[in-house]
Amino acid sequence: MSSSPAHDSPSSGSPAAMWDERYASSGLVWSAEPNALAASLLGDLPAGRALDVAAGEGRMALWLAGLGWQVTALDFSTVGLTKGRSRAEEHGLQVDWRLADATTADLGESAYDLVLVLYLHLPEPDIRDLLERCAKALAPGGHLLVIGHDKDNLLRGVGGPQDERLLYDTTLISPPADLQVLRLEQVDRPATGGVAVDTLLLATRPQLAPEPA
């Protein structure tokens, strides 16, 4: 997860093995700093329980843990999670590192106050299924944040998958009807070599109405 996506879907071979190899090939593949757009949207939320889906080396998970969140970081790369765990130990942070494939993992129901899906590019129907499960994992009052490369990135952006079938638009990542949309839009952001075009979804599950006295 990064200003350059951590989980642009590899084109062939075992994705988990390919990401293990990529994460093992250098220090940090992605910046140690949190994604700037995500941080700007989440920094004022009260700390609670968070799930970082496709957490990679854990930079968002570590940032949230530093703010007092109880974080579960889920990824299918053993190497990525090991690097995240090492950084957590260095900084005295507590994160639950969970080895699992986002496309099949049980995310629970009403379990989290925040669910992140940053730059995880999957074809349909996998991405729609994932977002449905992420929505179910939200507790009342919880927030879902999804950011990924937009289809327009192929025309006027840099980086990201070059297969349009893996790219986002506002229709593809529109949330289930039981969530309230706070933002659903295309956004441009600075990137190495130019501008990247992303799709952003920020939604919330409404609080339960109080029972009559």
Where do the PLM segments sit?
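Conserved SAM/SAH-binding beta-strand->alpha-helix loop
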Residues: 77-79
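A short glycine-rich, Lys/Arg-flanked "PGG" loop and its adjoining helix->strand segment in the class I
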Residues: 128-140
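A short SAM/SAH-binding and catalytic strip from SAM-dependent methyltransferases
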Residues: 113-127
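Conserved SAM-binding strand-loop segment of SAM-dependent methyltransferases
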Residues: 90-102
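Conserved class I S-adenosyl-L-methionine
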Residues: 1-45, 48-56, 145-173
